[in-house]
Amino acid sequence: TGEKPFDCTECGKSFTDLKTLQHHYKIHTGEKPFICAECGKGFNQKTTLLNHSKIHTTEKPFPCTECGKCFTERKTLLNHNKIHTGEKPFICAECGIGFTQKTTLLNHSKIHTTEKPFPCTECGKCFTERKTLLNHNKIHTGEKPFICAECGIGFTQKTTLLNHSKIHTTEKPFPCTECGKCFAEKKTLQNHNKIHTGVKPFTCTDCGKSFTQRTSLQNHVKIHTGEKPFTCTECGKSFSEKKTLREHNKIHTGEKPFTCTYCGKSFSQRISLQNHFKIHTGEKPFSCTECGKCFTIKSTLQSHLKRTHTGEKPFTCTECGKSFTKKKILLKHNKIH
């Protein structure tokens, strides 16, 4: 008949029978009497526990007819199907972004408020979702359970691993509308777009330099603190960034994965290849304000300024004490002795 005579006094929602209302009340009381014996997670209904239990087994009886992926629950399959249909019926009233599930919309809505009810007990950082907090906790525990089968790098989240995996394929489905460059991840494209817009929202409080990404600022700050936590096990040299250490390691392994398409010369670092390219293009974007001489690399300009215009001679002969502006001149001089 459609009659729902049992009303929840907390939220006003109506139900057809008393038993369903009693189950519903547990949402408001927080009562979760049904505990999973495998992982300890609690649920307010027995049926929800039974569905959850399937994740601890290989039982996935609900296959997707589009892509073949299988699911433990019919409800999860129905939500998954929206990926193929493109259906996003739950729209955020603030920004208009659509979502396939109501719960995802509710979690998203918190970014438009200051509500961050899930604090990290280690560092005090707060999060809008419990799931995000749990992922964040892996930073403190060092847990990286998702391992790339290609290169062995570990990740805290499965989604990060899936995005990373694209670097081992040619799949780059996110093109920049400004310059046409393609990216494996949407997030990387969004960061790249800041190059074209000039947006640099992250500013260093020490020197005022601004950056497009928070991670770039965090790495930059180490210049002021002198912090170099990443040490090479081969030669003991330390670095402020893990990425720089990885690049440095290629010196010891002899790996040179970046090859010049003009002349075939190979390099251990991408930036070395980019600088080398300028030899072929003739590009010299760094000009000396003193004499107007141009250079392909910023570091070469900096060396030029110090040695030519300041008279600095940092390379000293240990035999006779004579100093030189360049290392190669010192090496040539050493042959005299």
Swiss-Prot record:
It is found in: Nucleus. One of its GO terms (cellular component) is nucleus. Keywords: DNA-binding, Metal-binding, Nucleus, Repeat, Transcription, Transcription regulation, Zinc, Zinc-finger. GO terms for molecular function: DNA binding; DNA-binding transcription factor activity, RNA polymerase II-specific; zinc ion binding. Gene3D superfamilies: Classic Zinc Finger. Its main location: nucleus. It comes from the Eukaryota. Pfam families: zf-C2H2. A zinc finger (C2H2-type) spans 6-28, 34-56, 62-84, 90-112, 118-140, 146-168, 174-196, 202-224, 230-252, 258-280, 286-309, 315-337. May be involved in transcriptional regulation. Belongs to the krueppel C2H2-type zinc-finger protein family. This is Gastrula zinc finger protein XlCGF26.1. The lineage of its organism: Eukaryota, Metazoa, Chordata, Craniata, Vertebrata.
